[in-house]
């Protein structure tokens, strides 16, 4: 996300606030310290990016770091990038039986079929095996 600042005066304070605001938005939250609960006492289930993957933790409701996401999918989208870098074969919590394809990087570097539940999965979920191969396998070599 890119912020824009509208300066209506040449005040040094406004300019400083603008620069600080833009810098905070451009810094990737995935690099912040993971899983910081904070000093408050709520038990909010959130996700944090740690050791190359998104994991759940309980957030206290205040302070902490920006490495905190409301959902697993949001964490993966922000921290892992495109669909080929996301966890393969996430079924989700629903019970539909939808045939899909997912990219598995290691150890096979290939697209395989899986059954998607119909909700909450992630973007490593393709309706067409050819799209999966073209996007994930052939581009990576």
Swiss-Prot record:
UniProt GO cellular component terms: extracellular space
Signal peptide: 1-23
Tissue expression as described in the entry: Prismatic layer of shell (at protein level).
InterPro entries linked: Kunitz_BPTI, Kunitz_BPTI_sf, Prtase_inh_Kunz-CS, TFPI/VKTCI-like
The protein's name in its UniProt record: BPTI/Kunitz domain-containing protein 2
Cysteine disulfide partners in this protein: 30-79, 40-62, 54-75, 84-136, 94-119, 111-132
Family annotation (Pfam families): Kunitz_BPTI
UniProt KW keywords: Disulfide bond, Protease inhibitor, Repeat, Secreted, Serine protease inhibitor, Signal
